[in-house]
Amino acid sequence: MVFRIASSPYTHNQRQTSRIMMLVLIAALPGIATQLWFFGWGTLFQIILAAVSALAAEAAVLQLRKQPIAAILKDNSALLTGLLLAVSIPPLAPWWMVVLGTVFAVIIAKQLYGGLGQNPFNPAMIGYVVLLISFPVQMTSWLPPHDIAATAPGLLDALQVIFTGHTASGGDMNTLRMGIDGISQATPLDTFKTSLHAGHAVEQIMQYPIYSGMLAGAGWQWVNIAWLIGGVWLLWQKAIRWHIPVSFLVTLAVCSTLGWAFAGDSLASPQLHLLSGATMLGAFFILTDPVTASTTNRGRLIFGALAGLLVWLIRSFGGYPDGVAFAVLLANITVPLIDYYTRPRVYGHR
């Protein structure tokens, strides 16, 4: 009789990688639908461009590496990378930007390290940061939600802006970014940071149309709630574990509450931090990436808490209004160290 000697762990989750990735894609539907509702058809076009680019880039690299193309593409990891990048960029960003970011994410941040399971950094966030640093104007040109927009682009207008930079009537991004008050709009976090630097008081800032009397800004509050719903469904399906999203959100809430209590005239409120920007997307869909996150339960708690702290620090004192992507990548750097000091003790060893 021949016994096969295998290394630990000896218990395994029977779900295949493709199944888990598909669950994440399904869980993203509420967030995608909400972004489509508030920001228009551009989000859908960006997702399609990113998906095609991700599959094509991965297939090309697999062909060069003489790897089985069909079998690897079926794991859905390339699709998920493209999706996460597409929903993170402005819906009317030029078509070549999402293609460039997706190709960079798949080829450089994933396949260059050996493919799925070998990459130390989240590929989608690598692609996002490359685009943000290289094209800061285009990457911060978010449309105002449709309910406060002076002009809401339709299906054909969105398609034309993405591929030509202009609508059928000759309008451009500057026109489309105008709010009902005739002022060019930005995201709630960007508006808050920019207005503070301009010397405006917090009470005055929160009266801007972008906030519309809501806790965290028109549109963005509901987008984050939608991503939260998808994240809770992932927890219920046991596709992800609770440690990272809970520690991330708790740390962000605690830091922002303390900051707001002691410096409310210069720092954002907890509800703005929790329900604006990419908070819920990052908590449940990006930080929980099993490849680039910590692998122990204690390590996951530390990893999530570190990311939450970094998001608050970057948003409050850094040069970028959101900071989730940078926080994720900085936390990814610490994963080997976290895992080293939180790995379970082997029975019988000190």
Swiss-Prot record:
Q: Which regions span the lipid bilayer?
A: 20-40, 42-62, 68-88, 89-109, 123-143, 215-235, 244-264, 267-287, 301-321, 322-342
The topology of this chain with respect to the membrane is: Multi-pass membrane protein
A single cellular component GO annotation: plasma membrane
- Decide whether keyword Cell inner membrane is in the record: yes
Q: What class of enzyme is it?
A: translocase
- FMN phosphoryl threonine occurs at T187
Q: What is its EC number?
A: 7.-.-.-
According to the lineage, what is the superkingdom? Bacteria
GO BP: any one term: electron transport chain
Similarity comment: Belongs to the NqrB/RnfD family.
The role this protein plays is: Part of a membrane-bound complex that couples electron transfer with translocation of ions across the membrane.
Question: Can you name this protein?
Answer: Ion-translocating oxidoreductase complex subunit D
